[in-house]
Amino acid sequence: MSRMDDKRFNCEKELTLAVIGGKWKMLILWHLGKEGTKRFNELKTLIPDITQKILVNQLRELEQDMIVHREVYPVVPPKVEYSLTPHGESLMPILEAMYEWGKGYMELIDIDKNVMKESL
């Protein structure tokens, strides 16, 4: 059962935004897509402003939406790794286009890059 089963969408774009929207999901996807498989604490280090609770929730939602794969290894201490599914990998061209658009828009509106927090 998908997390989207009980929701209604007017168009496909609305569904896409429901899956990747929010403050943190695109950053999580970006790091997994650009840097490959990561453990929880590695993601937490890459996204320092995210709380542990929010990171857990966002990863669970992305897993439920079949965008992120969670691999649990039967070792002590527990080892869990996160990676993109093929469906998650298919989002990378979209995220790359959004990155390029944002970079161009930042120049257009003349945002001081030193003031803007670098999260990528």
From Swiss-Prot:
Domain of life of the native organism: Bacteria
Domain HTH hxlR-type residues, every copy: 11-110
PANTHER family reported in the protein's UniProt record: HTH-TYPE TRANSCRIPTIONAL ACTIVATOR HXLR, TRANSCRIPTIONAL REGULATOR, MARR FAMILY
InterPro entries: HTH_HxlR (IPR002577), WH-like_DNA-bd_sf (IPR036388), WH_DNA-bd_sf (IPR036390)
Protein name per the record: HTH-type transcriptional activator HxlR
Any GO MF annotation of the entry: DNA binding
Functional note: Positive regulator of hxlAB expression.
Key words, A-Z: Activator, DNA-binding, Transcription, Transcription regulation
This protein's record includes keyword Ribosomal protein: no
